[in-house]
Amino acid sequence: MRTLAILAAILLVALQAQAEPLQARADEVAAAPEQIAADIPEVVVSLAWDESLAPKHPGSRKNMDCYCRIPACIAGERRYGTCIYQGRLWAFCC
């Protein structure tokens, strides 16, 4: 019986020793999103839209998928303007 009590005490001490670093790590992880957000620079995307090239019917824009592409639009897409991203000019294709 005494051996069982000693083994239980050793087990509890070992578990407590592991729990303290886990709690400290959990505190670090909780603070990490604020730190990560401060490290990420802002991304600015600028779009230049040519209204004369826009579809004339309001319903035709409903399901339109548009992308910024380099160097040009792919087959089946039409260039509607220019995107400026990270200092580079991209084609605004729909």
UniProtKB/Swiss-Prot annotation:
Cellular localisation: Secreted
GO biological process, one term: innate immune response in mucosa
Keywords, alphabetical: Antibiotic, Antimicrobial, Antiviral defense, Defensin, Disulfide bond, Fungicide, Secreted, Signal
Pfam families in UniProt: Defensin_1 (PF00323), Defensin_propep (PF00879)
SUPFAM superfamilies per the UniProt record, alphabetical: Defensin-like
Entry GO MF terms: protein homodimerization activity
Cystine connections: C66-C94, C68-C83, C73-C93
Propeptide feature: residues: 20-38
Coiled coil ranges: none
Organism domain of life: Eukaryota
GO cellular component, one term: Golgi lumen
UniProt xrefs under PROSITE patterns: DEFENSIN
InterPro entries given in the database record: Alpha-defensin, Alpha-defensin_C, Alpha-defensin_N, Beta/alpha-defensin_C
N-terminal signal peptide: 1-19
Subunit and interaction comment: Dimer. (Microbial infection) Interacts with herpes virus 1 HHV-1 envelope glycoprotein B; this interaction inhibits viral infection.
UniProt function note: Effector molecule of the innate immune system that acts via antibiotic-like properties against a broad array of infectious agents including bacteria, fungi, and viruses. Possesses the ability to neutralize bacterial toxins such as B.anthracis lethal factor, Clostridium difficile cytotoxin B as well as leukocidin produced by Staphylococcus aureus. Also blocks herpes simplex virus infection by interacting with envelope glycoprotein B and thus preventing its binding to heparan sulfate, the receptor for attachment.
Family affiliation: Belongs to the alpha-defensin family.
Protein known as: Neutrophil defensin 3
